[in-house]
């Protein structure tokens, strides 16, 4: 099993290019199931979850082609299967996004209850209840969601009991081919939801209200082909900005979208970073200074993103002063704390809040990732720690970060991927 070895204590400097957003690319891949013509997707990140989704589409009978620029064209005109098997779905939560498109276009779908990161309950009830309100018959049998529709789904008014990104996306996709108009209230406002809506509209859908908490979808008879460029990954952007901040460095990130990161940029400035932005770039400069601790409270967009909580936990544990980090979106999302404590972090957990007291130095140690963003926080800790940190189970980080070690190397980090190591001899890795 691969690991990352990191020799910390180096100030990061340089520039890198940000990849396309995984959380936009995955629903857009699912949306190709709605199209009666091929759909081309550009700026798609090459990650394990993307590969898994492509394999799932291929098993259903879709034809997928990758061009010389690594863009993907998906043709779902000759689908033969309407089934998402457990052996694929168990590895990622986003696989449930095929449920709405399959049901809307083909009138049937059998999708295994999904897996993904172990960060608490992410109930699928919002998806099921919404599709039932649109006329679907749904049962859960032996771990599978079995959905059927007699004819087209029906437009209706839906109210989301809580803000759900995948729930909003699934119901929005299903509504594009429904008969009549669908209103989704308390809809997610995330940029990735907006990007999916733009792609669907390019395919011929009639969606309005993107970026607000009420989406209006006028159903159409069919959707056609399109070419769509996936928006930049705001969470990858935020992660590398934190890397620059906690190492006292200066980093420039290109091919990104500053407007989607306002809450994160404000907190980085509060931590002492100097930030400049352009249309598609961000420069962060800490000028060799130690960051100041900040208080964070996660909430749905446009508030501070839950997917940046773990990274800011790492920032706080090496910052001047004390800070509090409150998680309101998911429960059980502080599993990185125990591993950070092994490196010398001073953190106290009380319910859904972490209280941090910054220390001047972390110590490198073998640590184990438990989920995608927790793994990123451990890599960040390794960058600033004294000595060598070995991060195990990095298949988690590979689910969301394209070429993470290569990009960090471009910024000057001493980091490399290994297939095995001897714990007592990890300091020889960079001898």
UniProtKB/Swiss-Prot annotation:
Residues that bear 2-(S-cysteinyl)pyruvic acid O-phosphothioketal: 117
Superkingdom of the source species: Bacteria
Any one GO cellular component localisation term in the record: cytoplasm
Protein localization: Cytoplasm
Family: Belongs to the EPSP synthase family. MurA subfamily.
Chain residues that bind phosphoenolpyruvate: 22-23
Protein name: UDP-N-acetylglucosamine 1-carboxyvinyltransferase
Biological process annotations from GO: cell division; cell wall organization; peptidoglycan biosynthetic process; regulation of cell shape; UDP-N-acetylgalactosamine biosynthetic process
Species whose genome carries this gene: Nitrosococcus oceani (strain ATCC 19707 / BCRC 17464 / JCM 30415 / NCIMB 11848 / C-107)
GO molecular function annotation: UDP-N-acetylglucosamine 1-carboxyvinyltransferase activity
InterPro entries: Enolpyruvate_Tfrase_dom, Enolpyruvate_Tfrase_sf, MurA_subfamily, RNA3'P_cycl/enolpyr_Trfase_a/b, UDP_GlcNAc_COvinyl_MurA
Pathway recorded for this protein: Cell wall biogenesis; peptidoglycan biosynthesis
Known EC number: 2.5.1.7
This protein's UniProt keywords: Cell cycle, Cell division, Cell shape, Cell wall biogenesis/degradation, Cytoplasm, Peptidoglycan synthesis, Pyruvate, Transferase
Keyword Cell wall biogenesis/degradation: yes
Function: Cell wall formation. Adds enolpyruvyl to UDP-N-acetylglucosamine.
Binding site for UDP-N-acetyl-alpha-D-glucosamine: 93, 307, 329
């Amino acid at each position: 099993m691969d690991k990352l070895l990191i020799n910390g204590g180096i100030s990061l400097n340089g520039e890198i290019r940000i990849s396309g957003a995984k959380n936009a690319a995955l629903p857009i891949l699912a949306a190709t199931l709605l199209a009666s013509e091929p759909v081309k997707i550009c700026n798609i990140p090459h990650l394990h979850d993307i590969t898994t989704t492509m394999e799932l589409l291929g098993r259903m009978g879709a034809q997928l082609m990758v061009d010389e620029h690594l863009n993907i064209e998906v043709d779902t005109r000759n689908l033969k299967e309407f089934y998402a098997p457990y052996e694929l779905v168990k590895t990622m939560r986003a696989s449930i996004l095929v449920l709405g498109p399959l049901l809307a276009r083909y009138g049937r779908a059998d999708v295994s209850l999904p897996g993904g990161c172990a960060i608490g309950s992410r109930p699928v009830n919002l998806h099921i209840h919404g599709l039932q309100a649109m006329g679907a018959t749904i049962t859960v049998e032996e771990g599978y969601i079995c959905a059927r529709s007699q004819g087209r789904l029906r437009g209706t008014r839906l109210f989301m009991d809580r803000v759900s990104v995948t729930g909003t996306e699934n119901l929005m996709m299903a509504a594009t081919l429904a008969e009549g108009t669908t209103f989704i209230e308390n809809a997610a406002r995330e940029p990735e939801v907006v990007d999916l809506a733009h792609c669907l509209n390019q395919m011929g859908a009639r969606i309005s209200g993107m970026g607000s908490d009420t989406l209006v979808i006028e159903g159409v008879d069919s959707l056609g082909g399109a070419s769509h460029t996936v928006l930049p990954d705001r969470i990858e952007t935020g992660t590398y900005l934190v890397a620059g901040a906690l190492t006292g460095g200066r980093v420039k990130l290109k091919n990104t979208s500053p407007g989607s990161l306002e809450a994160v940029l404000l907190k980085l400035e509060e931590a002492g970073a100097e930030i400049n932005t352009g249309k598609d770039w961000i420069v962060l400069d800490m000028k060799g200074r130690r960051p100041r601790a900040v208080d964070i409270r996660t909430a749905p967009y446009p508030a501070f993103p839950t997917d940046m909580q773990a990274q800011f936990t790492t920032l706080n544990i090496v910052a001047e002063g004390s800070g509090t980090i409150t998680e309101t979106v998911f429960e059980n999302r502080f599993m990185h704390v125990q591993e950070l404590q092994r490196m010398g972090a001073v953190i106290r957990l009380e319910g859904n809040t972490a209280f941090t007291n910054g220390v001047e130095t972390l110590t490198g140690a073998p640590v184990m990732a438990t989920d995608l963003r927790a793994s990123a926080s451990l890599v960040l800790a390794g960058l600033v720690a004294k000595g060598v940190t070995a991060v195990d189970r990095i298949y988690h980080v590979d689910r969301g970060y394209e070429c993470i070690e290569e990009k960090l190397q471009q910024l000057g980090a001493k980091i490399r991927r290994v297939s095995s190591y001897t714990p007592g001899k990890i300091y020889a890795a960079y001898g």
